[in-house]
């Protein structure tokens, strides 16, 4: 009496609500899984923000006395008006970063500044060598400037930098065998908890300082004294840049983790709303099926 096509169509129509229900249940499971994952990530970002806030408070306290040493050492170069002769070609670029990430554009801003300086100095006929303080800056620049790397330092940023760390870096540079004429230290100077600025400070070799016209008025300065002062000055400037970079990094990480936590909250709210709507749709479909079945029996 009934055709085969009619029976097939009836079967498809009868099974359709069940497939819809299974699909909605699978969607609910996916949403639940995503919610759980995002909530776990939010816990991690909140914890990292708290850790970064504690480290930032300590770094900011230690930055104030470190600035005195750094600015004092830089004042000599400014007041002495040390200038490098045109025939001097060797330039050293020191980039200060760290081994840790999740702190915004802290490391990429240093790399961008160093790439720009390398291009400018190379175009001017200078011989440029690079020094990377921190594994992040080495990882960014080594792919494109591996032939210009003099030395790279790791294990930076895991603990607060000390003057001993800066002294080790300065000694390694002095013993590297590369006799540079002048150089620059590129780092992020801390301005506020939400702001930092990439800056560049000069450094000079012993020969450049000794041959400066303004230094010739001090005839009684012993060569050993001037050498000790130059080495101490180099360590001071590196220490100052490490402290500035460390404070900037912790404040940037704290801000980044705060933004990540807020974004996670927004995603949780949206997924919760989607979950509730999907669950309501499943319940509505089940009620329709029950009512339709009851009406058919009547």
Curated annotation (Swiss-Prot):
Which CDD domains does the protein's record reference? F1-ATPase_gamma (cd12151)
Residues found modified as Phosphoserine: 146
Query: Topology versus the membrane, per the UniProt entry?
Result: Peripheral membrane protein
Q: Which residues are annotated as modified residue N6-succinyllysine in the UniProt record?
A: 49, 115, 154, 270
Q: Where in the cell is it found?
A: Mitochondrion inner membrane
Cite a single GO MF annotation: proton-transporting ATP synthase activity, rotational mechanism
Q: Keyword Ion transport on this protein?
A: yes
Any one GO CC term of this protein is: proton-transporting ATP synthase complex
Short name of any one Pfam family annotated for the protein: ATP-synt
Q: Which UniProt keywords apply?
A: Acetylation, ATP synthesis, CF(1), Hydrogen ion transport, Ion transport, Membrane, Mitochondrion, Mitochondrion inner membrane, Phosphoprotein, Transit peptide, Transport
User: Where primarily located?
Assistant: mitochondrion
InterPro entries recorded:
ATP_synth_F1_ATPase_gsu, ATP_synth_F1_gsu, ATP_synth_F1_gsu_CS
Q: Which residues carry this modification: N6-acetyllysine?
A: 39, 55, 115, 154, 197
Q: Which portion of the chain is the transit peptide?
A: 1-25
The record ties this protein, via NCBIfam families, to: ATPsyn_F1gamma
Describe the subunit structure. Component of the ATP synthase complex composed at least of ATP5F1A/subunit alpha, ATP5F1B/subunit beta, ATP5MC1/subunit c (homooctomer), MT-ATP6/subunit a, MT-ATP8/subunit 8, ATP5ME/subunit e, ATP5MF/subunit f, ATP5MG/subunit g, ATP5MK/subunit k, ATP5MJ/subunit j, ATP5F1C/subunit gamma, ATP5F1D/subunit delta, ATP5F1E/subunit epsilon, ATP5PF/subunit F6, ATP5PB/subunit b, ATP5PD/subunit d, ATP5PO/subunit OSCP.
- What is the documented function of this protein? Subunit gamma, of the mitochondrial membrane ATP synthase complex (F(1)F(0) ATP synthase or Complex V) that produces ATP from ADP in the presence of a proton gradient across the membrane which is generated by electron transport complexes of the respiratory chain. ATP synthase complex consist of a soluble F(1) head domain - the catalytic core - and a membrane F(1) domain - the membrane proton channel. These two domains are linked by a central stalk rotating inside the F(1) region and a stationary peripheral stalk.
Please give the family membership noted in the entry: Belongs to the ATPase gamma chain family.
Q: What is this protein called?
A: ATP synthase F(1) complex subunit gamma, mitochondrial
């Amino acid at each position: 009496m009934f055709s085969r096509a009619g029976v097939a169509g009836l079967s498809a129509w009868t099974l359709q609500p069940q497939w819809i229900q299974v699909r909605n249940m699978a969607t609910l499971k996916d949403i639940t899984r995503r919610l759980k994952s995002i909530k776990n990530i939010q816990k991690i970002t909140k914890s990292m923000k708290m850790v970064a806030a504690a480290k930032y408070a300590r770094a900011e306290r230690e930055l104030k006395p470190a600035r005195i040493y750094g600015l004092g050492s830089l004042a000599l170069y400014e007041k002495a008006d040390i200038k490098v002769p045109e025939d001097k070609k060797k330039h050293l670029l020191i980039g200060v970063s760290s081994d840790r990430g999740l702190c915004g554009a802290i490391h990429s801003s240093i790399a961008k500044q160093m790439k720009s300086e390398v291009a400018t100095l190379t175009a001017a006929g200078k011989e440029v060598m690079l020094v990377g303080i921190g594994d992040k800056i080495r990882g960014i620049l080594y792919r494109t400037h591996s032939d210009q790397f003099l030395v790279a330092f790791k294990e930076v940023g895991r603990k607060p930098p000390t003057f001993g760390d800066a002294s080790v870096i300065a000694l390694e540079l002095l013993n590297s065998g590369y006799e540079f004429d002048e150089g620059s230290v590129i780092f992020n100077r801390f301005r506020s908890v939400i702001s930092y600025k990439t800056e560049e400070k000069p450094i000079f070799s012993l020969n450049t300082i000794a041959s400066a016209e303004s230094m010739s008025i001090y005839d009684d300065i012993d060569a050993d004294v001037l050498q000790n002062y130059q080495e101490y000055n180099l360590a001071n400037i590196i220490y100052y840049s490490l402290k500035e970079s460390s404070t900037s990094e912790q404040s940037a990480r704290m801000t980044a983790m705060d933004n990540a936590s807020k974004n996670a909250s927004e995603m949780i709210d949206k997924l919760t709303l989607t979950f509730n709507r999907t669950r309501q749709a499943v319940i509505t479909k089940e009620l329709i099926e029950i009512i339709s079945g009851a009406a058919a029996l009547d």
